[in-house]
């Protein structure tokens, strides 16, 4: 049986993946554990990811399973994730893709919080409080805008996921640090949100310069 991390624990796992971009696995290949054990979950984490996870661990269980709160493990009964929206961390442990994680977190975060998180997932850094600089660099983003657009398209209705769609319309991929993310949002957001309303073409993109003859 597979333990599927969720919410803040899934975000922590994605941040600890660093430069590794996992390939999604089919939802039919994941048999979710209905009654996950906290000790087994922690042991699987330590075999797949660096460091000790923050407690409590948040995990997804099948719809209708008992809800567990308190202690070292919190369970979230939910429907099965869409096909291709699960990443295998090791045998027995998985987490949602970045796009699926944003869908999970949408009800819990404000529009601006979602936008800041989107900047991180679409950038080349991961927030890591345990790291000396509070972040670590990675060579490529974990999420592309079109991947999130595809995931939101599965909702079926244009009125679904309004906060995520709002954030996606304003996200600028390619940020290399939290400070860059804050700067680009300050420049690009409208004045009512504390920004300057400037058009930002992109971040950290290559620029071809013609040689001087």
Task: Enumerate the predicted regions with their spans.
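Short gly/ser-rich loop at a beta-strand->alpha-helix junction or flexible surface loop bordering the NTP-binding
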Residues: 1-160
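Surface segments flanking catalytic/ligand-binding clefts of nucleic-acid enzymes
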Residues: 137-213
């Amino acid at each position: 049986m597979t333990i599927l991390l969720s919410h803040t624990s899934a975000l922590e796992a994605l941040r600890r993946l660093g430069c590794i971009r996992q390939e999604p696995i089919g939802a039919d290949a994941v048999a979710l554990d209905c009654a996950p054990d906290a000790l087994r979950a922690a042991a699987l984490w330590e075999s797949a990811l660096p460091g000790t996870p923050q407690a409590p661990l948040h995990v997804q269980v099948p719809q209708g399973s008992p809800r567990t709160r308190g202690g070292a493990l919190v369970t979230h009964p939910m429907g099965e994730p869409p096909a291709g929206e699960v990443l295998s961390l090791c045998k027995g442990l998985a987490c949602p893709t970045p796009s699926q994680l944003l869908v999970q977190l949408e009800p819990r975060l404000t529009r601006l919080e979602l936008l800041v998180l989107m900047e991180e997932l679409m950038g080349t850094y991961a927030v890591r409080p345990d790291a000396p600089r509070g972040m670590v660099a990675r060579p490529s983003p974990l999420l592309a805008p079109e991947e999130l657009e595809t995931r939101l398209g599965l909702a079926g209705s244009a009125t679904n996921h309004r906060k995520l769609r709002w954030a996606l319309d304003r996200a600028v991929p390619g940020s290399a640090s939290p400070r860059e993310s804050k700067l680009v949002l300050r420049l690009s957001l409208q004045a009512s949100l504390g920004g300057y309303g400037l058009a930002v073409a992109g971040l950290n993109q290559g620029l071809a310069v013609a040689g001087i003859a």
